Amino acid sequence: RATAGAAAVAVRGPGLLVTLADPEPAADDDPVGGGGDVDPRGLVSDSDLQRVVNALWASGAEAVSINGHRLGPTTAIRTAGEAVLVEFRPVTNPYEIRAIGDAGAMSEAFLANPDVRALGTISRTYGLRFDYSRQEDLELPAAPLAELRLARSVADAEGDAAGASRAPASPADRDEPGAAP
């Protein structure tokens, strides 16, 4: 369970599928330009995704992904310019958030969450598309492993330091003026 929560392994099981999407543009009469305006308050933002993800974790999710990108304990969801990023990878509309866990219990707690109810209001008022469903079988990938550039294992560091001078263990081990030889 710890490796699943840390996103270190792929997981499979029942859960919830939540979809957030920008509103459909209003129809207009312009045959050349096509499409109408969309109220920007209905566009999916990084904070909307954060709210859904946090509500899923609070509802008992054991593993979560956004558009196939697995979320771990330190995953950042943020905006850079017009793009929504999960870690440093852009994700695009529509946003599929998958959460593995007890679908029945999660569904009830998820819908009772105040942030989820607020998204329902935004959906009705500004057209943000918001849908969720219980799923019998979801599969989430493992998160990519972090690349260590400078860190080494303790065993490697000790092997490299054999024969090299060690740091003094106590002030008495230091060569300081007035210290006993």
Identify the residue ranges that each predicted region occupies.
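Core subunits and conserved enzymes of cellular information-processing
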Residues: 1-181
